[in-house]
Amino acid sequence: MTDDDLTHAIIGCAYKVHNTLGPGFLEKVYENALRIELEKAGFRVKQQEPINVVYDGQIVGEYYSDLWVNERVMVELKATLVLAKAHEAQLVNYLTATGINDGLLINFGPSVQVKRKFREYKPKIPLLNAILPTRSI
């Protein structure tokens, strides 16, 4: 399955969740429901995976990704009226910190909003091993 196919399937699952639950719930409700839907579709999903940003051998920041699908697509969820540039920047930062190339920003607002983002900066050090020491690659 290509990354395009994978992101398309994730988006389809998000629409199914939104069509079932409707708008108005907290982000965590949609996160849990989307994880269930993705797992039913046969995907490997990690939820609230820690992202440690390392500088000079020391952790200088820590984030948590909402969902990580098949260890290839980072999914950041929101439940707000509209998406803001800050939401997009958050996802791009997660992509940069992990070395993952592909991400989806999905908003479960009055209607589903989806933005696909790609890693913009390619660090000079191999980040996946340095930043996610708890993960096996």
Language-model region placement:
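Interdomain/boundary linker segments immediately adjacent to catalytic/signaling cores
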Residues: M1-T20
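Conserved catalytic cores of phosphodiester-cleaving nucleases, focusing on short active-site segments
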Residues: G22, V45, S65-L83, Y94
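A short acidic/basic microdomain associated with nuclease active sites
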Residues: A41-G57
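Nucleic-acid nuclease catalytic cores
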Residues: K78-I125, N129-L132
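Intrinsic disorder/low-complexity segments
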Residues: M1-T2, D56, P123-I137
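Hot-dog-fold acyl-thioester-processing enzymes
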Residues: P23-Y30
